[in-house]
């Protein structure tokens, strides 16, 4: 009897030591993400890049439009204060890279936001309603997806000229199409779940079911795809600017700076190296963060 009592006390003490606090889905995902060294390091580097493009123009002694006539096409020089060098017009490259980074990051993040808002709502409605409505909505999606996008951009530039608003409109037109397809597929499997059927029996409206029950359950996939969409949109904007269809003077982006640097690569290689370096590092960071989020939120890995 004494032995049994002692054993029970030992088991109770052992169970108290092994007691594990319950974690929610997002707490578990955060723990997984923080254990991914590449993703965490990329997040830190991306924060530093965002800090640079925000603060550097404020701290620099040169403005975006200042021209140093005595330092045209000058190599990076600490003494003169042109830490990244100057372009052919004597403008400070550090400030231009920082301002260009703002525009490139803004385009990528704005495209991801459009994809999240429009694509999630469109895809969840299409998948939940089903039937003929789903068929019509998907056919419309296929028509938009088959539209020659480059021709559309050239048409916009021809009629309305080149400005940053057109870039947002053009990229926003295509950024949500794949997101809508992905969310629709997730919704088709979710709408057969018991909690959706219970909401239907309880008389909950379609809008409430989509917003309160379906959308929160597809957020994991949405977050992962959005994080991988940002670098694609940044690269796409850079490609448009490189071709002369995107951001142009007096504004600039990393793609426009790459285009300028490529023309004088043999004479002034720093004009190409600095914007290219920032662009490549940013793209790698977003991709590593996307991979980390996918590993953290993928239900097959839990």
Swiss-Prot record:
Protein name, per record: Oligopeptide transport system permease protein OppC
GO CC annotation: plasma membrane
Chain ranges on the Cytoplasmic side, renumbered to this chain: 1-39, 126-137, 184-213, 291-302
Organism: Salmonella typhimurium (strain LT2 / SGSC1412 / ATCC 700720)
Membrane topology (Periplasmic): 63-102, 161-163, 237-267
Pfam families hit by this protein: BPD_transp_1 (PF00528), OppC_N (PF12911)
Domain ABC transmembrane type-1 per the UniProt entry, residue ranges: 101-290
Keyword terms of this UniProt record: Cell inner membrane, Cell membrane, Membrane, Peptide transport, Protein transport, Transmembrane, Transmembrane helix, Transport
Lineage: Bacteria, Pseudomonadati, Pseudomonadota, Gammaproteobacteria, Enterobacterales
InterPro entries the record matches: BP-dependent_transpt_permease (IPR050366), MetI-like (IPR000515), MetI-like_sf (IPR035906), OppC_N (IPR025966)
